[in-house]
Curated annotation (Swiss-Prot):
Residues 1-33 are annotated as: Disordered. This is Antigenic heat-stable 120 kDa protein. The keyword Cytoplasm applies. It comes from the Bacteria. One of its GO terms (cellular component) is cytoplasm. Keywords: Cytoplasm. Pfam families: 120_Rick_ant. GO terms for biological process: symbiont-mediated perturbation of host cytoskeleton. The gene is sca4. The lineage of its organism: Bacteria, Pseudomonadati, Pseudomonadota, Alphaproteobacteria, Rickettsiales. It is found in: Cytoplasm. Residues 14-24 have a biased composition (Basic and acidic residues). NCBIfam families: Sca4_fam (NF038365).
C-alpha cells in the first residue's frame, strides 16, 4: 500500500516501475540488440501488423503462448519502456535542469530513476510538466525519441527479422469494402484465434482542428479500429500498434511515423489481458461525444489515431481493472483552439491513478449503465445530472413531452441523451414555435444549473446549437428562428456575465459560419442577431470585446472573402444605426476597420468608403464636443468679453494645430464661429469682438502649419458660418465687419479678405439679404483698397523712389560744381604764367560743370519717368502676383519634364533650395504645387490599379526574331511593350520627402527677415 492508503501499483507503471537486477541485465542486453538490427522499410498501403517490405505500418501485433503464472512483462513491453519512455524521461530531465535548477535533487538521475518518477507522478508538478511539453525544442526531442524508438522496436521484434511470433503483416481474410471496412483474424503462433480486427474508414468534411499556432487543419479522412477489450478465445499475448494517419487519411513517411499501441499480456487464466496503452502526446479528441476521434499534433502536423473517445475510455478502464497502467505521456489542454466542432477536452494525466477510485467508478458505471464521472472522463463529461429542474408550469406552457422534460430536469443521462430526446421530439413536431419553445426550455435548464461552472454551460449550449444545425427535421429558415430563440435566451439570462456571454456568442458565430446546412442568407440573419445582442451589452469594454471576438471569428471562418466582405459591411451599417453615443460607435468601428485593414478582408474601394464613413462619424462627434466647449466658455458668468475672446482664440489655435485634414479644421472653426454668432448668451457687440479675435488667430497662425491656401479655405468657412447663421441681418453685418477688421489689424493677406467677399456673394441666403449685405461688402472693399494703397507705397519705397533723396542728389551735384568753380578761379588767379587769361579759362570750366549738372538732373528725371510709365519696372500688386504665378508654372513644368527620380531630386536642390535669386514665397508656392501634384498622381493610381502606362524596352540575345539589318545579322533585337503602374509608389515617396525637406529648409531661411517681409510685402502669403 502507498502512504496515502491507496494500493501501490508502481510495478505496473512503466514510468515508475522498479526493476530487479535480473530484469535490468536483460534490458541492457536487449538494448544492445536493438541497435544491431536493421530498420525495415515501410510499404504503401497504410495498414500492417508489423513493419516489413511487404506491408505498411498501421496495426501490428505480436502473439505467443507464455507459461501460465509468468507475470513478467514480455520483451515488447519492456522494449517500449526502455526505447521510448526512459529516453523521454531523460529529455524532460534535461529541460528541468536548464529551466528549474532548484529541482536538481528531485530529478537527479538514479539507477532506477525513483525520484524523477515520483516527481512526474505528483499532481502538484503538472503545471511544470505541461510547460515542458509546450517547449518547442523539448517537444521536438520527445517526438524524435518516440519515432526512433518505435522504429527500433518494430524492426527488432519482427518476424522478418527472425523473431518468433513477432510483428508481421496483416493477412486480410475478409474485405467487405476496400474503402469502408476491412477485417482480419489475429491468431497466436499455434494458429488459434485471439480476436477479429475491423477497420472502418470515415470520410468527412466537417472536422476542423487547430494546431498550437492557431492554424486550422481540415480532417478529410480517419479510421476506427475495434480494439478488443476482453479476449477469451485462446491463450497468449498480443500487441496492436496502429500508425497515426495524416489529416487526409494517408500514411506518413517512415521517419515521421508514430503509433497508438495496445499491449495485451497473458493473464492468470492464460488469456490476453489489456495491460497497457502507449500513445503519442498530447492526445486530443475532435469533439465531446464518445464518437469523437483522437488526434495529435506531431512535428507541426495533425495526425488521427484509430481510436474514439468512447473506445479510449473503455480501454483505460480495462487497463485499471487488470492492474495495468496507461503509459501515455499525454499532457492535455483545456480545449482545442477551434470552436468548429465544439470544445475538445483531453484527459488530464495522472500518470498514476489509484485503483480504489477506478474500481469505484467502474462499479458506478455498472449500476447506472451510463458513463460515470471518473478520473478518465471527468474533464470530458459535463455534469448534466446537476442541471436545475424545470418547474411544472413551465412544462405545461411549453407543451414539451415528459421524456424531454425528464431529460432536462433529472438528467441522470448524458448531454447526448438530452439531445437525442430533443431530436426525437423535433422529428414528431414540425411547428416552428414549438421547436423554438423546446430549445428555449433546454437552454434555460442548462444556464440555470447552479452547480455547473461556466465552461460546462458553454459546452452544453454549443452542443445544443450544433444539434440545431445538423438536425434535418428543422428546415433552413426555421433554423434561423430556433437559433435566434437560443440567442435571446442567452441574452436574457441574468446569471451569466456579459463578458462570458460574448464567449458563447463567439462560438455560435463559428458554428453558424462553418455550417454546410444553411445558406449565406441564413448565416447573415443569425449573425445580425448575434451582433445585435453584442451591441446591447451596456458596459463599453464588454461590448467592444464581444463585437471584436465576433468579427475575429468571421475572419477565421472558412467562408469566401467576398462573403466576409458582405458580412463586415452589414455589421458596419448595423453599428452605425445603433442607438448609442458617437464615442462608442467610434471605438467599435475603428476597431473593425483596423481588423479589415490588417487582414485585407475588404476591397480597397470598400475600405476607403468605410474610412470615410468613420471620418463623418468622428466629425459629428467632434462638432458636438466643440459646440459644448464653446457654450461653456460663453456661459461662464465671471468671464468678461476679453477673457472669453482669449479662450475662444486658444480653442481655435488648438484646432488649427491639430493633425486632422484641412476640411475637418474648416468645419470645426465654422462650428465655433456659428455657435458664437447664434449664441443668446452674448451681446452682438461682444460677438463681434470674439469673432474679430478668431479672424486674427487664423491670419497670424504659423505659415508652417497653416499655409495661405488653408487660411483662405478656413476663412471662407468662417464667413459662411456667420452669413448663414440665424442672426438678424444687422447683427451679421456687424460681425462680418468685425471679422474683416481683425484680418487687417493682423496685416492679413488680401486673398483672405477676398475669401470673405466671395463667400458673401455665393452664399445660400436669399437675394434681398445679399443686397442688404452689400454694406458689409463695401466695408470689405474699402479695406482692400486701403491695403492696396499701402502696398503701392511700400513698393515705391522698395524701388528707392524718394523725393528727399532725389533733391539731395541734385543739390549735392550743384555743390560739387560750385566747389569746382571756386578751385578753378583760385587756380587761374594764382597762375603767374600769363599765358591764358581768366576770361578764357573760367567760362569753359563753368560751362563744363553746368553741363554735368544738367546731364545728372536729366538722368534722374528720365529714370523717374521710366519707373512711372506703363513700360517701367514699377509694378502693381496684381502684376507682380501674375508674374510670380507664371514663374511658378514655368518651374513646375520644367520639373515635370525630368524623366528620372534622381533628376527630379537634383532639380529640387538646384532650383528651389540653392537658388536664392527666386523669392522665398515663389519657391514655397512651387513646392506646394508639386506636392499636390504628387499626391494627386498617387491617389489616382490607388483608385484605379488596373490603369497602366506602356513602356517600350529593348531586348537582345538568341531568339528566332529577324536581325535588325543584313549588315549586322548577329544582332537581334525586339521591342517589348511593358505595362507598368503610372506611379512608382516608392519613387513617389522619395520625391514627396525631398519636397517636404526643401520646404522646411526654405522656411528656415532668414526667419526674422521673413517675418518683417510678411508685415510689409503684399506678395501672396502662404
Amino acid at each position: 500500500m502507498s502512504k496515502n492508503g491507496n494500493q501501490d501499483i508502481s510495478e505496473f507503471d512503466p514510468l515508475n516501475r522498479e526493476f530487479t537486477e535480473a530484469e535490468k541485465q536483460q534490458q541492457m542486453q536487449q538494448e544492445q540488440e536493438f541497435f544491431s538490427q536493421t530498420i525495415l522499410d515501410i510499404a504503401d498501403d497504410g495498414f500492417m501488423v508489423a513493419s516489413s517490405s511487404q506491408a505498411t505500418p498501421s496495426i501490428s501485433f505480436l502473439s505467443n503462448n507464455r507459461p501460465h503464472g509468468d507475470h513478467k512483462s514480455d520483451p515488447i513491453t519492456e522494449a517500449i519502456r526502455k526505447e521510448i519512455l526512459e529516453k523521454q524521461r531523460d529529455i524532460l530531465r534535461e529541460y528541468f535542469v536548464n529551466t528549474n535548477p532548484e529541482l536538481a535533487e528531485q530529478i537527479a538521475k538514479e539507477e532506477d530513476d525513483r525520484k524523477f518518477r515520483a516527481f512526474l507522478s505528483n499532481q502538484d508538478n503538472y503545471a511544470l510538466i505541461n510547460k515542458a511539453f509546450e517547449d518547442t525544442k523539448t517537444k521536438k526531442n520527445l517526438e524524435k525519441a518516440e519515432i526512433v524508438g518505435y522504429k527500433n522496436v518494430l524492426s527488432t521484434y519482427s518476424v522478418a527479422n527472425g523473431y518468433q511470433g513477432g510483428f508481421q503483416p496483416v493477412q486480410w481474410e475478409n474485405q467487405v469494402s476496400a474503402s469502408d471496412l476491412r477485417s482480419t483474424v489475429v491468431k497466436n503462433d499455434e494458429g488459434e484465434e485471439l480476436c477479429t480486427l475491423n477497420e472502418t474508414t470515415v470520410k468527412t468534411k466537417d472536422l476542423i482542428v487547430a494546431k498550437q499556432d492557431g492554424t486550422q487543419v481540415q480532417i478529410n479522412s480517419y479510421r476506427e479500429i475495434n480494439f478488443p477489450i476482453k479476449l477469451d478465445k485462446a491463450n497468449g499475448s498480443m500487441h496492436l500498434s496502429m500508425v497515426a494517419l495524416k489529416a487526409d487519411g494517408t500514411k506518413p513517411a517512415k521517419d515521421k511515423a508514430v503509433y497508438f499501441t495496445a499491449h495485451y499480456e497473458e493473464g492468470p487464466n492464460g488469456k490476453p489481458q489489456l495491460k497497457e496503452i502507449s500513445s503519442p502526446q498530447p492526445l486530443k479528441f475532435v469533439g465531446t461525444g464518445d464518437d469523437a476521434v483522437a488526434y495529435i499534433e506531431h512535428g507541426g502536423e495533425i495526425y488521427t489515431l484509430a481510436v474514439t473517445r468512447g473506445k479510449y475510455k473503455e480501454m483505460m478502464k480495462e487497463v485499471a481493472l487488470n492492474h495495468g497502467q496507461s503509459v501515455a505521456l499525454s499532457q492535455t489542454i483545456a480545449e482545442d483552439l477551434t470552436h468548429v466542432q465544439g470544445p475538445s477536452h483531453e484527459t488530464h494525466k495522472p500518470i498514476i491513478i489509484p485503483n480504489q477510485e477506478l474500481e469505484s467508478s467502474i462499479e458506478q458505471h455498472t449500476s447506472q449503465q451510463v458513463p460515470p464521472i471518473t478520473t478518465f472522463n471527468k474533464s470530458l463529461q459535463p455534469k448534466i445530472s446537476q442541471i436545475h429542474q424545470l418547474q411544472p408550469q413551465q412544462a405545461q406552457s411549453s407543451g414539451i413531452p415528459n421524456p424531454v422534460l425528464n431529460a432536462a430536469n433529472a438528467l441522470s443521462t448524458s448531454m447526448q441523451d438530452l439531445l437525442n430526446n430533443i431530436n426525437s421530439y423535433l422529428t414528431k413536431n414540425q411547428d416552428i414555435n414549438k421547436q423554438s419553445d423546446l430549445i428555449k426550455e433546454a437552454a434555460i435548464a442548462i444556464l440555470n444549473n447552479k452547480k455547473s461552472d461556466f465552461a460546462e454551460k458553454q459546452y452544453n449550449i454549443i452542443d445544443l446549437a450544433k444539434n440545431i444545425f445538423s438536425n434535418k427535421d428543422i428546415i433552413a429558415d426555421a433554423k434561423v428562428n430556433v437559433v435566434n430563440t437560443l440567442l435571446e435566451t442567452i441574452q436574457n439570462d441574468q446569471n451569466t456575465l456579459d463578458i462570458k456571454k460574448s464567449k458563447i456568442l463567439e462560438d455560435t458565430v463559428a458554428i453558424t459560419l462553418n455550417s454546410e446546412n444553411i445558406e449565406l442568407k441564413q448565416k447573415q440573419q443569425i449573425l445580425e442577431k448575434v451582433v445585435d445582442i453584442g451591441l446591447s451589452i451596456k458596459d463599453d469594454i464588454s461590448r467592444v470585446v464581444a463585437v471584436d471576438s465576433i468579427m475575429d471569428t468571421v475572419i477565421k471562418s472558412n467562408i469566401a472573402n467576398e462573403d466576409k466582405e458582405k458580412i463586415f459591411i452589414t455589421v458596419f451599417d448595423q453599428i452605425n444605426s445603433y442607438e448609442f453615443s458617437n464615442v462608442a460607435k467610434q471605438k467599435l468601428l475603428d476597431s473593425i476597420l483596423k481588423k479589415t485593414a490588417e487582414t485585407q478582408v475588404l476591397s480597397p474601394e470598400q475600405q476607403q468608403l468605410m474610412n470615410q464613413n468613420l471620418d463623418n462619424i468622428t466629425t459629428e462627434h467632434t462638432k458636438r464636443d466643440t459646440i459644448e466647449k464653446v457654450n461653456n466658455i460663453l456661459l461662464e458668468p465671471l468671464s468678461n468679453t476679453a477673457l472669453k475672446t482669449t479662450n475662444i482664440q486658444v480653442m481655435t489655435s488648438n484646432v488649427l494645430d491639430s493633425p486632422v485634414q484641412i476640411e475637418m479644421k474648416s468645419k470645426l472653426i465654422q462650428v465655433v464661429t456659428k455657435t458664437v454668432a447664434e449664441s443668446a448668451l452674448v451681446e452682438p457687440k461682444d460677438k463681434t469682438e470674439i469673432v474679430k479675435g478668431i479672424g486674427k488667430t487664423i491670419v497670424t497662425h504659423s505659415d508652417t502649419s497653416l499655409p495661405l491656401h488653408d487660411k483662405v479655405v478656413i476663412m471662407g468657412s468662417v464667413a459662411k458660418g456667420i452669413v448663414e447663421s440665424k442672426n438678424d441681418l444687422l447683427d451679421r453685418e456687424l460681425i462680418i465687419a468685425g471679422l474683416v477688421d481683425g484680418i487687417y489689424e493682423a496685416k492679413g493677406d488680401n486673398a483672405v479678405v477676398h475669401a470673405i467677399s466671395s463667400m458673401i456673394a455665393n452664399s445660400n441666403i436669399n437675394q434681398s439679404e445679399k443686397e442688404a449685405l452689400k454694406r458689409s461688402q463695401d466695408v470689405v472693399s474699402e479695406k482692400v483698397l486701403d491695403k492696396e494703397i499701402q502696398n503701392l507705397d511700400r513698393e515705391l519705397k522698395a524701388q528707392n523712389i524718394n523725393e528727399s533723396k532725389l533733391h539731395d542728389d541734385i543739390y549735392n551735384k550743384t555743390q560739387d560744381v560750385a566747389n569746382a568753380l571756386k578751385n578753378v578761379i583760385t587756380t587761374v588767379l594764382d597762375d603767374n604764367s600769363g599765358q591764358r587769361g581768366v576770361s578764357e579759362e573760367a567760362p569753359k570750366k563753368v560751362s563744363s560743370l553746368l553741363n554735368d549738372i544738367s546731364k545728372r538732373t536729366i538722368e534722374k528725371i528720365n529714370n523717374l519717368r521710366a519707373m512711372l510709365s506703363q513700360d517701367g519696372n514699377l509694378k502693381t500688386f496684381e502684376e507682380k502676383k501674375d508674374e510670380a504665378t507664371k514663374k511658378v508654372d514655368e518651374l513646375v513644368k520644367a520639373f515635370d519634364n525630368k524623366s528620372s527620380t534622381e533628376e527630379q531630386q537634383n532639380f529640387i536642390k538646384s532650383n528651389l533650395i540653392d537658388n536664392k535669386t527666386l523669392s522665398r514665397e515663389i519657391r514655397l508656392q512651387i513646392i506646394d504645387n508639386l506636392l499636390k501634384a504628387q499626391a494627386q498622381k498617387r491617389a489616382e493610381t490607388i483608385e484605379n490599379l488596373s490603369a497602366k502606362t506602356e513602356d517600350v524596352r529593348v531586348i537582345s540575345g538568341k531568339s528566332e526574331l529577324k536581325p535588325i539589318s543584313q549588315d549586322e545579322p548577329y544582332i537581334q533585337k525586339a521591342k517589348m511593350v511593358v505595362e507598368r503602374d503610372r506611379v512608382d509608389i516608392k519613387d513617389n515617396i522619395k520625391i514627396m520627402s525631398a519636397l517636404i525637406n526643401a520646404r522646411d529648409s526654405i522656411q528656415s531661411e532668414n526667419f526674422n527677415k521673413s517675418i518683417h517681409i510678411k508685415k510689409e510685402s503684399s506678395f501672396p502669403q502662404r
